């Protein structure tokens, strides 16, 4: 009798583990809004769920960092009031875009494991409304709560840095010796001292590259590198760098704003208001990393060498398709025109 009971108990535990495992696998493939980039690990740990959403006051759009509103998890988003607000605050340190609330916020169940940054963050930790990314080590990330009306960025123990990009060109040199800020780029350099070209296309630590003038001239010695057209911020896979090219075939450096027009023109120091999304998919392999990166197809338009393993989450960003703790579902179907 005891043996039967033991077998039954073990079977139940085993079945429970399988169910939990399947649930975990499902949770990490959750999608996010088209203006968000999925972090490299723990997609289910991005935003905390909050059950008191019914009592949440309206968002003060003019000063979001002082607002204490919360956004509920994905299954409750349809019940959130004030859908016209520019943004919602989540757990004092997060905001999510208000344009599409259908599938933005995954569950976050390890709120107590997060280290919060003080509210007096410098301007260097603000994020432009068109750019967002989250560090790969979500289990021990630090949140930055200096945000604008649309986006939030996260750091991971001072290692991951996101860049604010507000114009087509940068006219000042970045001081590579220390943290550097101008109105276009914010850099906390580690690898960046290697790059002395007057362009503002810099490698940030080992994990991020930012677009800029003549970015195609930067290839990291000793590391596999990829050149990708248009705006692309890619989380780390080891030390791979991703740098968008800028040359005769890619004079399209502009901030996409999802206007109706889908053409893009090159203008000096002026933000373009249109975004030709199809060029996001043209790329060039620099040092043979095809086994690590790939692109989804955009309306049949594709330029370059054999497929690389990067999958597109939205028009502006690409994220690695595989790491030991991360998976991003591949975009399927034709890309729609940029939304207004």
From Swiss-Prot:
It comes from the Bacteria. Keywords: Signal. The keyword Signal applies. Residues 1-26 form the signal peptide. GO terms for cellular component: cell surface. Adhesin that binds to the host cell extracellular matrix proteins fibronectin, fibrinogen, collagen, and vitronectin. This is Extracellular matrix protein-binding protein emp. It comes from Staphylococcus aureus (strain Newman). The lineage of its organism: Bacteria, Bacillati, Bacillota, Bacilli, Bacillales.
């Amino acid at each position: 009798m005891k043996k039967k009971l033991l077998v039954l108990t073990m079977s139940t535990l085993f079945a429970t583990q399988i169910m939990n495992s399947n649930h975990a696998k499902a949770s990490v493939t959750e999608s996010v809004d088209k203006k968000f980039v999925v972090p490299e690990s723990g997609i289910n740990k991005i935003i905390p769920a909050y059950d008191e959403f019914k009592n949440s006051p309206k968002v003060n759009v003019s000063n979001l960092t002082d607002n204490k509103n919360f956004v509920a998890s994905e299954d409750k988003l349809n019940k959130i009031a004030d859908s016209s607000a520019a943004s919602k605050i989540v757990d004092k340190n997060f905001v999510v875009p208000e344009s599409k609330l259908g599938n933005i916020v995954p569950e976050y169940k390890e709120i107590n494991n997060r280290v919060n940054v003080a509210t007096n963050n410098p301007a260097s930790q603000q994020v432009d409304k068109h750019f967002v990314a989250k560090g790969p080590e979500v289990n021990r990330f630090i949140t930055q709560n200096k945000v604008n009306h649309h986006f939030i960025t996260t750091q991971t123990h001072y290692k991951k840095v996101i860049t604010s990009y507000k114009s087509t060109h940068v006219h000042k040199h970045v001081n590579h010796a220390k943290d550097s800020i101008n109105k276009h780029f914010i850099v906390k350099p580690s690898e960046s001292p290697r790059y002395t070209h007057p362009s503002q296309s810099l490698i940030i630590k080992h994990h991020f590259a930012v677009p800029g003038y003549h970015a195609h001239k930067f290839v990291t010695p000793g590391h596999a590198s990829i050149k990708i057209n248009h705006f692309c911020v890619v989380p780390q896979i080891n030390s791979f760098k991703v740098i968008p090219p800028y040359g005769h075939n890619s004079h399209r450096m502009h901030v996409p704003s999802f206007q109706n027009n889908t053409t893009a023109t090159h203008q000096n120091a002026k933000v373009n208001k249109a975004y030709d999304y199809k060029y996001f998919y043209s790329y060039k392999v620099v040092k043979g990393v095809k086994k690590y990166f790939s692109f989804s197809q955009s309306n049949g338009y594709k330029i370059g060498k054999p497929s690389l393993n990067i999958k597109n989450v939205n028009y502006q960003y690409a994220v690695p398709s595989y790491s030991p703790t991360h998976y991003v579902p591949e975009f399927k179907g034709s890309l729609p025109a940029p939304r207004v």
